[in-house]
Curated annotation (Swiss-Prot):
Lineage of source species: Eukaryota, Metazoa, Chordata, Craniata, Vertebrata
Biased composition (Pro residues): 22-37
Region Disordered: start-end pairs: 22-55, 81-107
Protein name as annotated: Proline-rich protein 34
Length: 138
């Protein structure tokens, strides 16, 4: 893994300022927001930024399974939570319940999907991380 990817994998949560008053009233598309700068690190309470359910893939990390980092409001392919959970999500949630970080607002075992050009879906399972950085198991 390149050094930059290693640094990004272990970086603290990202904290972005609120949208300006002149921004459109519709929810912002994470793929249209600029990537955060190196100086934008979280210095705000966790409750101010709950764990997002939408964000962009930043890179893949090698391992026994592909892993990705989900950064909200950054450009890239968007992942979203489906309305219904994956059939295996309940068993995975039970298996990973103890892995939840103390004080994390996120719950383990949530199922995400990534839309592909071929109209097929790739399931990704949420693993809890600090509020604005989510690790997904694909």
């Amino acid at each position: 893994m390149p050094a930059s990817a290693t640094a990004a994998w272990h970086c603290p949560p990202l904290c972005l300022p609120p949208l300006p008053a002149s921004a459109p009233t519709s929810p912002p598309n994470p793929a249209t927001r600029p990537a955060p700068g190196p100086g934008r690190r979280a210095r705000c309470p966790q409750s101010a930024h709950p764990a997002p359910t939408r964000g962009a893939l930043t890179f893949w990390a090698p391992g026994s399974w592909p892993r990705v980092l989900l950064v909200p409001r950054s450009p890239g392919p968007v992942l979203r939570a489906p309305r219904l959970p994956h059939p295996a999500a309940r068993a995975r949630r039970r298996a990973w319940h103890g892995a939840r970080l103390p004080g994390s607002p996120a719950r383990a075992g949530r199922t995400f999907q990534r839309g592909l050009v071929s109209n097929s879906w790739a399931h990704a399972i949420f693993l809890p991380r600090p509020p604005n950085v989510l690790e997904l198991q694909v």
